[in-house]
């Protein structure tokens, strides 16, 4: 229920950091039309188990699910690029942290992307939750979902409070 923008930013961050830590940091995971197969992603992750654990902890994803989530995010982002002609978000201003001694190296060397202005505006206009509720909404979630972190729902709760419609919103 958070803006799709924030979920896709998380996906972009995950892909560029994966590319830096496990692949060749060449942008292929985003820049090429061909998909990197999930088995190949898993093989690259399996070669660096300590990094995989750090990566999984940072993104709140179990190590066993990393390849699947990275593959899925790659698919979604490449589809968005093909539909809208570019990324609706970028990482030019992103400062990465949470990787300990690697933070400086990641920030210095990770591949950076500019947002496409048309795609960015399209997402703002069409995929941003308003928080304006006129009927009851029940958000059901678990404490672990590899694609949608619990914080996703916390965002929407705040937006409904701002719009004075939180009495229509409940989480479980």
Predicted region positions:
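Conserved alpha/beta-hydrolase "acid-adjacent" motif
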Residues: 146-152
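Catalytic histidine neighborhood in serine/cysteine hydrolases
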Residues: 135, 161-172
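Short, well-ordered amphipathic alpha-helices
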Residues: 153-161
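Functionally constrained cores in energy, signaling, and assembly domains
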Residues: 85, 135, 148
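Functionally engaged cysteine thiol sites
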Residues: 1-2, 172
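Extracytoplasmic low-complexity repetitive segments enriched in small/polar residues
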Residues: 103, 133, 147, 165-167
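Short beta-strand/loop motif that positions the catalytic acidic residue
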Residues: 138-141
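Accessory cap/linker subdomain of secreted extracellular hydrolases
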Residues: 2-130
């Amino acid at each position: 229920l958070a803006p799709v923008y924030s979920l896709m930013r998380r996906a972009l961050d995950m892909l560029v950091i994966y590319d830096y830590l496990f692949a060749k940091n060449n942008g292929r995971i985003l820049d090429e039309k061909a998909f990197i197969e999930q088995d190949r992603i898993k093989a690259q992750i399996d070669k660096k188990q300590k990094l995989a654990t750090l990566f999984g902890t940072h993104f709140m994803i179990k190590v066993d699910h990393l390849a699947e989530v990275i593959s899925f995010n790659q698919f979604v982002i490449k589809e968005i690029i093909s539909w809208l002609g570019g990324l609706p978000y970028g990482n030019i201003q992103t400062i990465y942290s949470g990787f300990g001694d690697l933070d400086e190296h990641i920030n210095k060397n990770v591949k950076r992307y500019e947002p496409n202005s048309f795609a960015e505006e399209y997402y703002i206009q069409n995929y941003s939750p308003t928080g304006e509720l006129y009927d009851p909404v029940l958000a059901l979630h678990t404490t672990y979902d590899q694609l949608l972190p619990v914080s996703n729902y916390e965002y929407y709760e705040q937006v409904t409070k701002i719009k004075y419609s939180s009495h229509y919103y409940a989480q479980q």
